[in-house]
């Protein structure tokens, strides 16, 4: 288990949890999102490879249309 900070809230996740797993957990896989991992923007192609560790800080922004 690991404790991370997700959009300012403390969250406990399983070991070997990737950014993609986090998106699945919050039902954001098919949404347009930007993810910041410890202050760096992560490209979508790296979501499955980027494993989360204890004390990581994650910010997820998803875009919604409107008019």
Where are these regions (language model features)?
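Eukaryote-biased recognition of intrinsically disordered, low-complexity regulatory segments
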Residues: 1-9
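Short amphipathic, charge-patterned alpha-helical segments
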Residues: 18-27
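Short, basic/aromatic beta-hairpin or loop at an interaction surface
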Residues: 27-38
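Short acidic beta-strand-loop surface patches of small beta-rich interaction domains
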Residues: 36-49
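Loop/turn positions that initiate beta-strands
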Residues: 55-58
């Amino acid at each position: 288990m690991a404790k991370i900070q997700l959009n300012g809230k403390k969250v406990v996740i399983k070991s070997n949890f990737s950014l993609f797993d986090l998106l699945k957990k919050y039902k954001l896989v098919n949404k347009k999102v930007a993810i910041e991992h410890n202050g760096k923007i992560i490209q979508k192609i790296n979501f499955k490879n980027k494993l989360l560790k204890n004390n990581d800080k994650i910010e997820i922004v998803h875009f919604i249309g409107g008019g």
